[in-house]
């Protein structure tokens, strides 16, 4: 679980961050894992604990919290549960991004496999099976522009380790 605090006056234009408010709880499931109904309730509990952790009464306003659930697969059972048991709506906003409405705080579900490569190259690439050599070349090109940044280094390490075969193939053809 990751918590991202957003500045009050800062607008996020990135498609996966448009829903963000002041306090954003993010659950990222590894490519081998899936997002279950119980994972949802665990994360929902994290939001409640986070909200209650202020130094004074109602210091963290529930309307300033979001929950983002990130998974490489589409959580069909969870979505069915949210619709049928909770009575919430789950709406596809764009490729790989779904908003859940009906709750007191905004929730989004991100399916990394379905994300647009053009808009979400790095997040989409954090999986075990990169789609193509073109995608690897795009990653390498963008990485070259940011190789001095720790975040890019960390992400690239994970991506290469998870996709060593295709990176070797691309390297041999260079």
Predicted regions and their residues:
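Elongated, amphipathic alpha-helical interaction scaffolds
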Residues: 1-174
């Amino acid at each position: 679980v990751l918590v991202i605090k957003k500045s009050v006056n800062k607008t996020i234009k990135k498609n996966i961050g448009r829903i963000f408010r002041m306090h954003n709880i993010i659950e990222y499931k590894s490519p081998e894992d899936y997002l279950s109904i119980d994972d949802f309730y665990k994360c929902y509990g994290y939001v409640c604990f986070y909200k209650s952790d202020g130094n004074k009464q109602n210091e963290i306003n529930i309307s300033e919290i979001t929950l983002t659930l990130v998974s490489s697969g589409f959580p069909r059972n969870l979505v069915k549960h949210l619709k049928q048991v909770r009575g919430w709506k789950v709406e596809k906003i764009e490729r790989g991004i779904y908003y859940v409405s009906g709750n007191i705080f905004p929730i989004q579900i991100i399916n990394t496999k379905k994300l647009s490569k053009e808009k979400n190259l790095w997040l989409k690439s954090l999986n075990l099976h990169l789609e193509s050599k073109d995608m690897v070349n795009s990653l390498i090109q963008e990485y070259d522009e940011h190789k001095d940044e720790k975040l890019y280094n960390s992400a690239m390490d994970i991506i290469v380790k998870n996709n060593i075969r295709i990176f070797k193939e691309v390297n041999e053809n260079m």
